[in-house]
Regions:
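Catalytic histidine-centered segment of alpha/beta-hydrolase-like enzymes
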Residues: 143-155
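C-terminal alpha-helix
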Residues: 155, 159-167
Length: 167
């Protein structure tokens, strides 16, 4: 799971310790920020309408460092998200924390974080690794948030297959 998807995966693993044998989490934030939470509604509330403009979406897209050939899909998907849903996703993402049950997870979990990500992401990766008994952490050189699975899908799949073959 990547980012918000990774939070959902970790939540599932904390509730159902034997749901899977292997899992990958990439760029997952587990350090809650009440300040960020409080800023999301006013910030996105006032500028949400801009995402419908391609020029603005291109700026946003560029900041995410996603392969350029994925822009049309990104634009379509982003425009389809309602304002209230976008705010809810971002707010929940900003206050997520690991649950105690995560320590009982039976899956082998590979944790990836980009070398060029924010410190909070790197710290989150370490926290996840410390809480999960059977986990491995890898800092990906020269990569930003979510770049591994999105921009390097072939390498990502290779790593996934390596994890499965190890057992």
């Amino acid at each position: 799971g990547l980012s918000l998807g990774g939070q959902i995966l970790l939540e599932t693993l904390s509730q159902r310790k034997d749901i899977c044998k292997y899992a990958i989490v990439e760029s997952v934030l587990v350090i809650p920020s009440k300040f960020t939470y409080s800023m999301i509604k006013p910030a996105f509330g006032s500028c949400y309408g801009l995402i419908k403009y391609k020029w603005f979406s291109k700026l946003q897209f560029k900041s995410l460092r996603i392969k350029s050939n994925l822009f049309d899909e990104y634009y379509k998907d982003t425009c389809a998200i309602r304002k209230s849903d976008m705010i809810a996703f971002l707010q929940e993402n900003s206050v997520y924390s690991l649950k105690d049950g995560i320590g009982e997870c039976e899956a082998t979990v590979q944790i990836y974080v980009g070398e060029k990500e924010k410190q909070s992401m790197k710290k989150s990766a370490k926290i996840i690794h410390e809480k999960l008994q059977d986990s491995f952490i890898q800092v990906l050189p020269n990569m930003y948030h979510g770049e591994f699975s999105i921009n390097h899908a072939d390498d990502y799949v290779r790593k996934l297959l390596e994890i499965v073959k190890r057992r």
